[in-house]
């Protein structure tokens, strides 16, 4: 038997308990930042408890004065009763305000911290999670942590103090009454035990289901045009109903057990209350206590019962906290990007910005986490005042190469450097820190809600109107922006609403040009433009006096003859095409 118990305990330590302990330590790292707030909240709670207990004693005296069991000044006792009642209200409201104020502050600080950590998490690892799941973890789980940090330990101290102080008063006047008041504790403990595992499982499933529902709604609202175009309204409505049905069934399944437990707890509460009431009547009848003392006992009996229930309720609260901590730890403990070269990159840019900055990547090999090999010994180079094109069928690795250039992905083999102009003597390793040297225009619509000017200034806060207009001209966007009634102050709706795809692409390119980064990456960023406009945009970039390096990915070979070099991505390599091959591509397009 002893060996079996030890085996079970070992299993618990290696499993749930070990995991919960690790999650608790993670919460503690945040909790110790706010120890002053926790002390303030605890002190307010203790003062409130003290005022409440003194009010019970004064209430006893007041009843005894009225019933004639005690002589005293009725008016002064009544005034004291009112005074402590008002004090209790003031302390309660002050505690509530302080709790709300501190909780909001802590919540925003923790969310900011989690948000910052999410943004520097390894990109490929982060893509394993749906964006709806990430938002749910950041919002709901982070709020749960902030609330728990402020409330859990202070409430443990407050409820324990309330229980012990009330119990001490009851024991002082009538130890037997304390037995009746504490009668429900063993039953509460026994009934709460089967709920704990179910509660943890339910909380985990509930969090996962909430994330799934949020992700579904987010995707549906983001793709309303597609849903309407394919006449999928009924399909998506039924799919939402199915998800909601699963969620409701999960909640009701747990609620059935909760109701049964609640009914049993209520019955036990009635038994305890009426036992205390009966014992109080008997003691009054036998002249052992006064009416005032019985009134105080009944009040303190409720305090004892509520304190025990409050302490028991901290257990599911702790479980919920550890689950939220675990969900956040899944994200923030993923590999983090290294930004230790920020200072070196800034200095490098400052020294060589006038001559321009290029890149040189040699013998790269890269395989995704899922085992898909994309590159093997691939090489690419691009220098200031050059336009370098990457061509190839979809899925061959054009976008992956741009991710390698941006250090969103790290090659398993090979070397990648940023260089001063075309000088291979002055180079710096590519890393997340070198992203500040790039302007990136990805596939699709990347405009934000707001005005055109606000979109432009997202990348350069101090940009003047003249600089914005100049960037719009380079991207061939000023022609249509100039004709708008509000010009650069015209409103851009969500996802570039109000503008055609071609116009939105030109605005995105203008925003990237405004940043005046040494290297410009265009990932199919001209796909919605007609050939003439596409060539004009690229020529403008090439003829600009700013020493910019430009790398474009494209499916259309019609602009390749204005590029300095063209790399064909095939067979996991980047091969430079000669003029004959480029001409053949243009002819067969």
Predicted regions and their residues:
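Membrane-integrated ABC transporters
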Residues: 1-51, 67-77, 95-99, 103, ...
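Juxtamembrane loop-to-helix connectors within ABC transporter transmembrane domains
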Residues: 31, 99-103, 119-164
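An intracellular "coupling" helix at the cytosolic face of ABC transporter transmembrane type-1 domains
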Residues: 36, 123-124, 140-149, 153, ...
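Transmembrane helix-loop-helix hairpins at lipid-water interfaces of multipass membrane proteins
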Residues: 38-94, 98, 172-176, 287-291, ...
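A hydrophobic transmembrane-helix motif
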Residues: 51-60, 153-196, 249-298
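Cytosolic ends of transmembrane helices, especially the final helix of ABC transmembrane type-1 domains
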Residues: 232, 256, 304-334
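ABC-family ATPase nucleotide-binding domain "signature/switch" substructure
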Residues: 400, 439, 444, 455, ...
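Conserved post-Walker A segment of ABC ATPase nucleotide-binding domains
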Residues: 403-473, 536, 540-547
């Amino acid at each position: 038997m002893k060996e079996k118990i030890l085996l079970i305990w070992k299993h618990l330590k290696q499993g749930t308990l070990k995991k919960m302990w690790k999650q608790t330590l993670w919460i503690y790292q945040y909790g110790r930042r706010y120890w002053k707030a926790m002390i303030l909240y605890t002190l307010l709670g203790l003062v409130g408890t003290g005022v409440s207990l003194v009010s019970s004693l004064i209430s006893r005296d007041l009843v005894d004065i009225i019933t004639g069991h005690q002589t005293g000044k009725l008016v002064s006792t009544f005034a004291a009763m009112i005074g402590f009642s008002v004090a209790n209200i003031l302390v309660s409201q002050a505690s509530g305000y302080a709790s709300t104020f501190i909780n909001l502050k802590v919540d925003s600080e923790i969310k900011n911290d989690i948000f910052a950590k999410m943004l520097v998490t390894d990109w490929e690892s982060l893509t394993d999670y749906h964006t709806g799941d990430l938002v749910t973890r950041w919002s709901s789980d982070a709020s749960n942590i902030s609330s728990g940090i402020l409330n859990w330990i202070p409430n443990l101290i407050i409820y324990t103090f309330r229980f012990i102080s009330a119990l001490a008063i009851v024991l002082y006047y009538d130890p037997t009454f304390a037995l009746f008041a504490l009668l429900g504790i063993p039953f509460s403990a026994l009934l709460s035990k089967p709920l704990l595992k179910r509660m943890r499982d339910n909380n985990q499933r509930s969090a996962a289901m909430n994330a799934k529902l949020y992700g579904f709604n987010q995707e549906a609202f983001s793709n309303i045009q597609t849903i309407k175009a394919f006449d999928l309204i009924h399909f998506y409505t039924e799919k939402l109903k199915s998800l909601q049905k699963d969620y409701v069934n999960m909640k009701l399944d747990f609620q059935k057990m909760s109701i049964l437990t609640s009914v049993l707890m209520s019955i036990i509460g009635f038994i305890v209350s009426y036992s205390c009431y009966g014992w109080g009547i008997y003691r009054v009848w036998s002249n052992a206590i006064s009416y005032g003392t019985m009134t105080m006992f009944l009040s303190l009996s409720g305090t004892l019962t509520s304190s025990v229930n409050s302490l028991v309720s901290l257990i599911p609260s702790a479980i919920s906290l550890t689950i939220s901590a675990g969900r956040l730890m899944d994200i923030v403990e993923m590999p983090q990007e290294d930004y230790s070269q920020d200072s070196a990159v800034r200095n490098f840019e400052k020294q060589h910005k006038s001559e321009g900055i290029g890149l040189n990547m040699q013998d790269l090999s890269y395989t995704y986490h899922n085992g898909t090999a994309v590159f093997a010994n691939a090489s690419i180079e691009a220098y200031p005042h050059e336009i370098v094109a990457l061509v190839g069928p979809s899925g061959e690795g054009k976008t992956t190469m741009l991710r390698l250039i941006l250090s969103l992905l790290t090659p398993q083999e090979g070397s990648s450097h940023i260089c001063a102009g075309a000088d291979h003597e002055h180079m710096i390793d590519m890393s997340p820190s070198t992203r500040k040297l790039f302007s990136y225009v990805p596939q699709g619509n990347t405009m934000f809600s707001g005005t055109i000017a606000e979109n432009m200034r997202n990348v350069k806060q101090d940009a003047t109107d003249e600089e914005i207009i100049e960037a719009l001209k380079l991207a061939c966007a000023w022609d249509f922006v100039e004709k708008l009634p509000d010009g650069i102050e015209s409103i851009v709706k969500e996802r570039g609403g109000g503008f055609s795809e071609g116009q939105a692409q030109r605005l995105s390119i203008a925003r990237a040009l405004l940043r005046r980064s040494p290297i410009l990456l265009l990932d199919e960023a001209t796909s919605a433009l007609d050939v003439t406009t596409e060539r004009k945009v690229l020529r403008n970039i090439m003829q600009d006096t700013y020493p910019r390096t430009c790398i474009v990915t494209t499916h259309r070979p019609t602009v390749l003859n204005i590029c300095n070099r063209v790399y064909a991505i095939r067979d996991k390599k980047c091969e430079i095409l000669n003029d004959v091959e480029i001409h053949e591509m243009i002819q067969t397009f």
